[in-house]
Curated annotation (Swiss-Prot):
Protein name, UniProt field: Uncharacterized protein Rv2077c
GO cellular component term, pick one: plasma membrane
Main localization of the protein described in the UniProt heading: membrane
Endpoints of the signal sequence: 1-45
Intracellular or extracellular location(s): Cell membrane
Region described as Disordered: 186-227
Organism field: Mycobacterium tuberculosis (strain ATCC 25618 / H37Rv)
Membrane topology: Multi-pass membrane protein
UniProt entry keywords in alphabetical sequence: Cell membrane, Membrane, Signal, Transmembrane, Transmembrane helix
Record carries keyword Cell membrane: yes
Amino acid sequence: MLATLSQIRAWSTEHLIDAAGYWTETADRWEDVFLQMRNQAHAIAWNGAGGDGLRQRTRADFSTVSGIADQLRRAATIARNGAGTIDAAQRRVMYAVEDAQDAGFNVGEDLSVTDTKTTQPAAVQAARLAQAQALAGDIRLRVGQLVAAENEVSGQLAATTGDVGNVRFAGAPVVAHSAVQLVDFFKQDGPTPPPPGAPHPSGGADGPYSDPITSMMLPPAGTEAPVSDATKRWVDNMVNELAARPPDDPIAVEARRLAFQALHRPCNSAEWTAAVAGFAGSSAGVVGTALAIPAGPADWALLGAALLGVGGSGAAVVNCATK
């Protein structure tokens, strides 16, 4: 069924222009965030398997994001060009309608063309009827071209962006272990774990964060951690955000290391308060600008702000935590 005359008059490509701008901005934002992560991962003086793993991961993720960004830029180009094509097709329809009206015909909502002159000789009436039919045919032809242009642009956009939302980042890289490895002394038939909140016999923690590195963050039994509640909440948030990563994931390891240092080697109160406040602001900003990044924007935004200094405040946290 063809569109009505009112629908054709109101036909708009504003959504395509808006989408093109949003896709371009999003592509630039994604690449900027992940490029900064990759570059600063290479600038960090962190040697060994963990540092190699971080650099490998940020390189791979930047490559993935660059591919997605290119798709969005292609979609933006299609949307802009398509908007021009559709606008031209819509104008062609309206020109045909105006031609019919200028010739003394009425164009109805259903695109039918009727003569406004009812009393005229039979020969003239027959000629006018033939003219009306020709004008109606031309209008309908142009409407068909308009609908076809809209459908073509829609199909091109679907083909270009269809898999963007399904992109997944590669899993954590496999890091070869050296001959010397950290070991724990957990026994499957060991003592019964203590109740929640009590110190674990091995110095670790029971519950979902019982890996050796996370357990290091617990303050010594019977002592107060020399940090504020805000710092503790920050550490808890970091661990919770990265809990889905495997314990030996280099990124999770480094995040836990930073959290450990925050608990055990804090700056003075004023410095740490400023650093945490800055981190909170930049983290929220990165999460906001990382909208629609598939597969894990929260943990990357957190690590990007805290470890790699996105927006500068993450660097303040690193400097403060490692004093």
